[in-house]
Amino acid sequence: MNRFSYTLRKRAAARFFILALFVAAGIFLLTFFSRFGLRSPVLTEISPSVGSAGDILVLRGQNFGSSRGSSYVELCGNRLTESGYVSWDDDLIKVIVPGNTEDGLVYVATRAGKSNPEFFANELAIPVEMPENPMFSVPIITELSLAEAAPGQIISISGRNFGSSRGESNVYFSARREGEREESVPNLDGYDTKVETQKYVGFLTPSEADFDFEYWSENEIRVRVPDGAASGSVFVATSEGRSALQPFLVKSRVGKKTWTGRHTYLIQVGADFHNIKGGDAAAVTIHLPRPIVSALQPEAIMTESNPEPALLDYRGNSIFQITPADKTSAKNYSGARQNYVVTSCGMESEVYKDYVGLFKEKDRMLYKAYTRADEIIPADDKAVLELLPKIVFQVKNPYRQAELVFDYFVQNYKILPKTRNGDANPLDLIDKKRGDAYDFAVLYAALLRCAGVPCRILSGVLIDSDKQTRNHWWNEFYIENFGWLPVDTALGVGMEFKAFQGEPNSGKYFFGNIDAQRVAFSFAYKAIKQSLLSNKTVSMPRSFALQSIWEESTADVESYSSYWIVPAVLGIY
């Protein structure tokens, strides 16, 4: 018996050691043959090879294993965590690119080893070709002459790339109203600032009806702070892009305006024409009024037109032309219809009368335009000149003068239930003490203009709670360094009116305040020139817009009939 056998029999420790040695050898051999018996993973493709955090990365190849188990994907030096795996199959793996990923190699690791690598690039780290420097075209504001101003005051905007003339370019001021979203201007940081036809929510532009633009050049713009502007920002937009926002404060010690609500209407305007007869050159031109845009009516967007107009917007009208050949039925019928989405705002004012002064800038175009007599406002008529001092006496304050005239109307005049004939004289109201809303608006404007207070007539439709519309006229008068104030004398004296909610406002409320139950089509009377002196024209006094021509027919037109609809409300939102 040899010593080795004797030791194994006599010593238990020796026997345990030998057993452990055999077990370890067996495990080693099993692991060795198992590993080298498996096929190593092969990575043939990753998609996308360029991506960013959050992307799904797809790995294609073979020998990944039917389930993940202890296998893993290594992406750019980091092993993916449990939450990074979407699916795992023998030839396809889907993972989520984590947030800390940079450029680097991608591996698949299994018990058989690591695959060959594929390269992944983070797209945010890839250099890109710089776009053409817009500094040479996009408008840039370098300075505002005033950091704070009142409505109507002139500010000078200095900079470059404004353009030698205004054209379609514009200046935008903040304008916050009840229910309106915050100012919304696309991000300017990347200089991706090409202007498209769009509305900047929360901003308004200077008014051409108020003659707000004073001067425009490549390096300087002089513009008046528009009525309705609020503290916030100002910027310039041209066809080449937009400038950066500049902080700007709008303050007036004269008083304040509060936006009290808003309604959005889908409204239809149009006219029907029948039995147009005439020669080959016969044609009828339609001047279809468009809703205006103002501080109280900030949006008027056409959504549909049938047919398409010859001119979409010419001096506030869409122009259509129809001929005897334009037939939609055997009755020789034709016409035009347009739908608009119009937003109307209510407003209440608080005026500190002691801070209202006499108008100083009497050479200003707004003052000249809205204090003179015109085609429909007889501010220089003898009857007006005689009546005014009986109402205002020695009062010189423009706000008090406007208030005294309003009070005089409420105390002395009655409103007629129906609109009078178009050729009726509005000054009949002085003697007869009765008139319609048009008479009230004309006489009120005439008295204020005679007193040297800028005043204008707005025409449009009043909208009842049952969506019924009627032609209506009201006024606005202008206070320097404050802006326009609305006045509705017809409603002030008690014209019947169905409010959307509760009892309608009445009396003094309609001096300096206004509801949102109306849509305006005219700021003032619009004198339209006929295309040819030989053309025949049709006017429509006391209608929803104030303009000299509504229809115009060539000399070859023998006869036709027409019917204009009162703008109809199709929906309220």
Residue ranges, per PLM feature:
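Proline/serine/threonine-rich low-complexity linkers at boundaries of modular beta-sandwich domains
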Residues: 30-41, 123-138
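N-terminal Lys/Arg-rich, disordered targeting/topogenic segments
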Residues: 1-13
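Hydrophobic/aromatic-rich core segments of domains that either
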Residues: 439-534
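Immunoglobulin-like IPT/TIG beta-sandwich domains and homologous Ig-like subdomains
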Residues: 26, 34-114, 142-242
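Hydrophobic membrane-insertion alpha-helices, especially the h-region
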Residues: 15-34
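Acidic low-complexity segments
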Residues: 313-416, 424-427, 431
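Low-complexity, Gly/Ser/Thr/Pro-rich intrinsically disordered linker/tail segments
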Residues: 508-573
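Intrinsically disordered, low-complexity N-terminal segments that are enriched in acidic
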Residues: 247-345
